[in-house]
Structures are given as C-alpha cells and as structure tokens.
C-alpha cells in the first residue's frame, strides 16, 4: 500500500555530485513494510537544509515509522519543515488519541516543533527517549515532564502481537542522546542515523543498491567517519540481532543489500584507524554552531585521508581525552564563548591537552561566538605560550556558520592534513639514518636516541617491566647499550653476569608508557601485561607488540655510580616493529629528574 506520491523524480542513477534531482514539491510517501508496520517518508527533493555541511544536493527523506499492534508506537517524527504536511497525513492512518508511544531516537531544535504538536494532540502518548534526551525535553517542555519515559540500553517495550522493541542507547559525539530500536516481531532494526543515505526518490527499498554506493560512502564519511569508535560499538550491539531489514532515518530502507552495507560499515570503520595520521577533534557546543563547524573541519580532514576522532567534551570522560591526545599526531580544539569565557568542559580539556600533548603535535583552534569570542583567543594564546605550532589560523565565526564559513572550515581541515604530513616528513627525515644496508638488529640499535623504553625481565617465571629513559648506545662491535637505573631497587635484578632482558623502545603518540613506572611492579599489584599485547623471546622476556622496536640483551658488566647502577649489555637480536614510527623521547626540565 503506497499513498499518493507527489510526482516522479528524475533519474538518480549516478552518485556524481553534479547530478540533481528534480525540484518537486515536498510530500509524504506512506507504505506498509511489514505486518502492522508502516513507513512515512517525508521527501525533500532539492538541497538538504538541516545538515548544511552536507553538499551533495540530491535531496533526502526523513523517515518515520508507525507500529500498530495492541499498543501503537510512532518512531522518529520529522522536523519542523515537514510538521504541517506530516500532521495532515498521519491521521489518515492513526487516531492520534489512541497513540501510546512516541519514540525519539534523538532530539534537536528542529524536531521539537513536531514533538510539541504531537504531544498536544496525542494526549495519552508517552515519549520514549534516552536520559540525555530527557534532560533537553524537560527543559523545553517542563509541563509535560511526567510524559517523558527514559530508557536504558536493552530495555524492552512490548507493543503486543509479537512486537517487542529492544531499545539500545548509542551515544556518539554528534548525537549524545542516540537511541536505536529493534522489533523482534518484524526483525527490523530502526537505526536512525546509521545506514542512511541522503537521496530522494520513489523507491521505498534499496533495489538499486549498487547505484547507491557512492552516496552511502559519502554519507558515512560526512556523518560517521569522525566517530568510528562509537559506530563500532553500535555494530557490536547489533551483531546478535537477526535482521530482515534496516529502517534508517534517511533514504531507502535496507533489505536487498543488508549484509553488504553492514560489512561496508565495518570496513569503513576499520579504515580510519589504519590511516597513518590521526587528529583529535575536541569541542563543546552551546547552541550547535561550534559542533557544525567541527563537522565541517572533520569532513576536510577525512577527505584528505586523515583519521579523525571527535571528542564532545560535554559527554566525554577525562581519560578519553587523555587517550585521544596521546594517540593523535595533531589536535584541534573548538569552543563557544559563554559570558566572555570558555565552557568549563573546554577549560578542563585544555588543561589535559597542555599537560599531555607533546610539543611535536600540530594544533588548531576554532569557535563560534555572539559578541566577542574571548574563548577562542584564550585557547589560541595558551597553546602559543605552550610552544605548539598551528596547522591553520584560528577560525572565528559569529553566530551560525553560513555556507561560506563552512567552506572555510572544510578547507582548513584539508590544510591541516597537508601541514601534518609535511610536519611528520620533516621529523622522520631528522631521525632517519642510513638503514638500507644495515641488518635488522643494527636498525633497532639505531633507534636509540636517549629514548623512552620499557625494560622487561623475568625471574622464576615472574615478569617485570620498568620504564626508563636513561639509555644510550655504548659500542658498535658487538652492538651494546648502557643503561642507568636507581641503585636502591637492586638494579631490578639486572646486576648479574649474562642476565637477560629486553629493551622495548616506545613509539611517540602511543599510550604504553602510562602502564609502567620507574619502580618495579609490585608483587601483588595490577599486572599491565594482562592489558597489553605481548609475546616472549627466546630468553624468556616479553616484547610489547606496540613497541617501536625491541632489543634482546645480555648483561656483561655493571658498576655502582653514585645513586645509580650503570649496566652495560650486548645486543643479541632486535627488530624494528613500526618502520614509520618516531622514537618517544623524554623531555626533562631538570637534571635531577629520572
């Protein structure tokens, strides 16, 4: 059953950016997709309005779903631009007085207008949403607070006749209130922003899915590439489900290419971490303007082949920011200005950045403001004083960014990626040695530059790991190293002829070092090796898989020198594990620090 359609579109068979759909009136397309289940597709044929950084211009649909069993549920009503059309069409299929539930996969100012009208007309309906969404709704509609029903992940909503909605909270930096639903009766996953496509046409389903490939990838890159970690978490939740269909928030429903698109999402997520360069994009947004700028910058970075991890400071934990900073090659911080200041979350994040990010990482600053923009100046000056280099000039946008402003953001993201590549090539060139004629062991020895490493030993089956930065090459034939360690720790058991150990040289930007200390691991304490991938050498000591290089060593001699023991060891074997990596170096401000 399909309700009247406002006309046929022009061909949509090319994914080219230059192809436009016909400019037809907006309409609502209704069809039954499963027993007791309908889709209402609000169709926009020309330029996409509500995601202004999305410039493909092939129109879109805003998909809403109606399940009519013993109880009735309406999933994801559209935004304000379709409110009147939608509320005129919906009563043809449903008496609003009998509507039991409205499920909101996410909320935003655009959708609030339609939700308000529905709540006024459907007087007994409960609004189902995540906890972050409920906070926004209660602030917007305080007089309806008792009608908002918050859910936790894996909560069930039984509609009768076999329709049981399994609700899954899926927060992302872009949609902190994200919620998906799975109907066990119809085996349909209502996926909201996942698996969608911004294309408008007459096809309800994806019969011509091969022709959607370019649009699907473009949609993923624009909306999800900067948040692949969260997308993979969502996919993990979906894995146990038996699916006949995916019902996204935009574009054709996925039935004919179900396994292919699901597999594509896995592959696209995995492609991001495999990029050689990674940027941490850290922001907070009061009214959505700074978030829009962040998405445009991320789009420029992704197009330039750089992996992006977006961190929404309003929902991120401090340890997430620390890990993102340690793992990235460059970082970009965005902030609104509220009362002449940066939000508290950004001030906290900036403190973490200044204490965690090495000076070799490239930096960027952007933000929106109403009148003065002091927050942007604050962040920029703090980073300048900290000695960081910038990948682009600070971007300042007053009020909401228009298309020209977003183009500046996208271009700045691409420029940042180019600067990052140049910056990294220069660093590699400074470190490079003549390695082509050297064997693997000599290459590994060549990585020693007063570098940070983890010494691993083993005694009677117990493995030990100690962080050190006092190491240098001591001989060429045979290759040997000199290692200084505090004497009060009995040389960590290294003061013994032919004592075996492994020196794991660490890679800059990785977080391995936070698992170790300059003191031996306590006997009954937490064992970091249980959390780190590793394997044993022939001498029984451990190699850390994330190390830049490793050296298998034998102690030849040692001397007590002041408050330290100086150990000389010969290198028996070694290998560079990350040929393109950079050696992590300890920068000290005082010679009295270990």
UniProtKB/Swiss-Prot annotation:
Q: Which cofactor does it need?
A: Fe cation
Alphabetic keyword roster:
Electron transport, Oxidoreductase, Transport
Entry's Gene Ontology molecular function annotations: electron transfer activity; FMN binding; oxidoreductase activity, acting on the CH-NH group of donors, NAD or NADP as acceptor
Q: How is the cofactor bound?
A: Binds 2 iron ions per subunit.
Pfam families given in the database record: Flavin_Reduct (PF01613), Flavodoxin_1 (PF00258), ODP (PF19583)
Q: Where is this region: Zinc metallo-hydrolase?
A: 57-250
In the Enzyme Commission scheme, what number(s) does this protein have?
1.-.-.-
Give the source's domain of life in one word.
Answer: Bacteria
Query: Could you tell me which residues belong to the region Flavodoxin-reductase-like?
Result: 445-594
Record InterPro entries: Flavin_Rdtase-like_dom, Flavodoxin/NO_synth, Flavodoxin_CS, Flavoprotein-like_sf, Metallo-B-lactamas, NADH_oxidoreductase_modular, ODP_dom, RibonucZ/Hydroxyglut_hydro
Pinpoint the Flavodoxin-like domain residues. Answer: 279-417
Q: Which PROSITE patterns match?
A: FLAVODOXIN, FLAVODOXIN_LIKE
Quote the function comment for this protein. Mediates electron transfer from NADH to oxygen, reducing it to water. This modular protein has 3 redox cofactors, in other organisms the same activity requires 2 or 3 proteins.
Additional facts recorded: By homology with NorV in E.coli, may be involved in nitric oxide detoxification.
Checking PANTHER family in the record gives: DIFLAVIN FLAVOPROTEIN A 2-RELATED, DIFLAVIN FLAVOPROTEIN A 4-RELATED
Q: Which family does it belong to?
A: In the N-terminal section; belongs to the zinc metallo-hydrolase group 3 family. In the C-terminal section; belongs to the flavodoxin reductase family.
Name the chain's protein. Putative diflavin flavoprotein A 4
- The source organism is Synechocystis sp. (strain ATCC 27184 / PCC 6803 / Kazusa)
